[in-house]
């Protein structure tokens, strides 16, 4: 064995070998050395561009982050007054879906889901309020500009190279290289993912598509990606529909559904996913996309069915497991939810959120010994961005066992980690209200409603205080806000019925 010669790859073959093994930094270094010896080596030039673009690759199917301009200045929505259940802005009402008591909402007014997604954390409201809100890991403020964020990402990775910019686009003959099928794909991905110059990337894709006689589905998909980044959603839809006529791909169906979601047409997105499932039966990407849309529309039963189909096809899909577990927990089945969360734990995922969820499920299922150990584990491993939620849930458990003093202390600790934690403000206000400290309770309720206007508990409790103090006009406004968030809340309806004779007598 010792006498056998060992094959050692060198030059371009070594770079290709390293690239296939996903050792991108080493492959890039080999390509750099080769280009110093021969700057006109086109194959090495293309391989280095591929290494750089793969190092900053972002999956466009999961890239849902939108900036302030895209969020508040969106002119692509087709129906501003859509029927409930046919628009993300108007999901199914509480009478048909899960009410906010059983399914709490986030600061953005959306029901809690099993996983955090960028688009599900957007906080609607005025542009002025969003600009004045600082963007941290704990807020729902959209980024100032997605294009600027991507540009900073590209320039930061580019600055890491000692040779500076690899391709000088200002001096490059774009039309020449874009028409060359040997290097145009690598050049496009380098400009699109690494440099994030969407204008030049669009020029490359347009020239390449023209050189291919407008018959290459790949370039139609790339043009659609550019249009999606630029906010030209109608043009993106046309390119993707034309691409599907030539070749049906999973990516094309998913991108077309994404474009429909961006223009607030979830029904069209669901039809596109269904058409994709006819071509690619039980595909995880299609099923997951359909489940997300159904969840955003308030169709939790349909969403869970789709997530279960995802698990039948891919049993280790964490998003599907977490979403099914969340639905079971809020549906009053903590034992089933605990099984799913433990499955995630067995797969090697370890996070304070997971331990906290297991602890809450154990507490609801009367398994107090496991609940205590899980919550202590969550408390010991928590980070700053989840500390407020951990302490809030600890306070909830202390309220359940009757230790109100320690519960109030837990809510204060939660507020010290996140002053905008509206749930802790409301619960602390309720405890102050029980103690007879009406002014403190009123102040806490007011803070909660200003932090999260979509949480009906804050508006209802503040309206109740106003009703007892004789401030009937303020009470009516607050109760109407609470009913807008939870139309079937009986206590709000009773207060409104008490107020009607007073207004009629005037």
From Swiss-Prot:
Give the start-end ranges of region Disordered: 83-112
Q: What keywords appear on the UniProt entry? A: Cell projection, Cilium, Cilium biogenesis/degradation, Cytoplasm, Cytoskeleton, Protein transport, Repeat, TPR repeat, Transport
Q: Name one GO cellular component term.
A: cilium
Q: Does the keyword Cytoplasm apply?
A: yes
Query: What is reported when this gene is inactivated?
Result: Mutants have normal body morphology, but with reduced body length and width, delayed larval development and decreased roaming movements. May exhibit defective chemotaxis tendencies. Defective sensory cilia structure and function. This is characterized by increased accumulation and mislocalization of intraflagellar transport proteins and impaired movement of intraflagellar transport proteins such as rab-28 along the ciliary axoneme. Disrupted assembly of the BBSome complex at the base of the cilia.
Q: In which tissues is it expressed?
A: Expressed in head and tail neurons. Expressed in ciliated male tail-neurons. Expressed in thermosensory and CO(2) sensory AFD neurons.
Give GO BP annotations, semicolon-separated. Answer: chemotaxis; cilium assembly; intraciliary transport; non-motile cilium assembly; olfactory learning; positive regulation of intraciliary anterograde transport; positive regulation of intraciliary retrograde transport; positive regulation of protein localization to ciliary membrane
The cellular location(s) given in this protein's UniProt record come to: Cell projection, Cilium; Cytoplasm, Cytoskeleton, Cilium basal body; Cytoplasm, Cytoskeleton, Cilium axoneme
The stretches annotated as TPR repeats are 217-250, 251-283, 284-317, 319-351, 353-385, 388-421, 423-455, 456-489
Supply the PROSITE patterns for this chain.
TPR (PS50005), TPR_REGION (PS50293)
Superkingdom in the source lineage: Eukaryota
Q: Does the keyword Aminoacyl-tRNA synthetase apply?
A: no
How does the annotation summarize its subunit structure? Part of BBSome complex, that contains at least bbs-1, bbs-2, bbs-4, bbs-5, osm-12, bbs-8/ttc-8 and bbs-9.
Q: What is the role of the protein in this entry?
A: Component of the BBSome complex. The BBSome complex is thought to function as a coat complex required for sorting of specific membrane proteins to the primary cilia. The BBSome complex is required for ciliogenesis but is dispensable for centriolar satellite function. Required for proper BBSome complex assembly and its ciliary localization. Required for cilia biogenesis and both the assembly and movement of intraflagellar transport proteins along the ciliary axoneme.
The protein depicted here goes by the name Tetratricopeptide repeat protein 8
Please name the source species: Caenorhabditis elegans
Which gene is this protein's source?
bbs-8
